[in-house]
């Protein structure tokens, strides 16, 4: 399964978990069932979901540092989760080049976000990737 589809699925799972206030595991199972997908084909999506949820506090601190005028709670759920996914890949996945993580996030924003999502996501990620060491989580 292509990584783009895996990222789309991970985003859907993270969104569902946050909105429905359920565990990532339960949201993943629901998503697999809803779309008739085989969990074995979505191992990278599962890894992204698990990784983002395990490090969500660290990722959110980065987002908060960069988005001075936007509190996390004010951000659209989909935008917040796209940024979390991208930051997870930037800081915790050495096999994913930074430009790939950012470009994939922009595609997710174009597909799942609002008219302004792509610009918003690009602004946040752009600041981080300009100086990744400045924002690297502890």
Swiss-Prot record:
Taken from the UniProt entry, a GO cellular component term is: cytosol
Of which family is this protein a member?
A: Belongs to the NusB family.
Q: Which UniProt keywords apply?
A: RNA-binding, Transcription, Transcription antitermination, Transcription regulation
Q: What does this protein do?
A: Involved in transcription antitermination. Required for transcription of ribosomal RNA (rRNA) genes. Binds specifically to the boxA antiterminator sequence of the ribosomal RNA (rrn) operons.
Q: Name one Pfam family in it.
A: NusB
What processes does the entry annotate via GO biological process terms? DNA-templated transcription termination; transcription antitermination
Output one GO MF annotation: RNA binding
Answer whether the UniProt record assigns the keyword RNA-binding to this protein.
yes
Stated name of the protein = Transcription antitermination protein NusB
